[in-house]
Amino acid sequence: MRFLGHASSAEGLHVHRPEEIIMLVAESGAGGVLDPQERRLLENTLRWRDLTARQAMVARTRMLGAPVDLPREEMLELLASSPHTRLLLYEDSIDNIVGTVHLKDLMCPPAGAWDARRVVRTVPFVPEAAPVAEVFAQLQRRRQALAVVLDEYGGTAGMVSVDDVVEAIVG
């Protein structure tokens, strides 16, 4: 195209597809140029666009949740015995999540009789097959820390947080 007076925007550049970069990273790791941690971080970063919510999520059996009508003191006890600051709240079963309650809302409840429904924070719901990159972007856009992951039947499969996404990349 240069002979027609059109310059290529990639002229002089070595452009690589992600698969080729992964191969270069693997070869650099095998050749001792990268240590194993650097290699894993680079490979995970390049593969994160292929990662799904299911692959990064915390399974429902490991989620911290409680019925929305649980007394406030019991919610506080659940959070006190865990490393978390948020508690998933559900109506009837874990398949019917209504949102989360934050520790600070439990510590400083609104005046009047306790009703978690008054302080519950909504959470987004995403399908298991949702790309982690899209889930991460949605959480950032909505300024939320976690999303509930739904299985193919609409039941709760698990949850994925910003920290889970970072962990999936960093390892």
Predicted regions and their residues:
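Low-complexity, charge- and small-residue-enriched intrinsically disordered regions
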Residues: M1-H16
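Soluble cytosolic regulatory domains appended to membrane proteins
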Residues: G12-G171
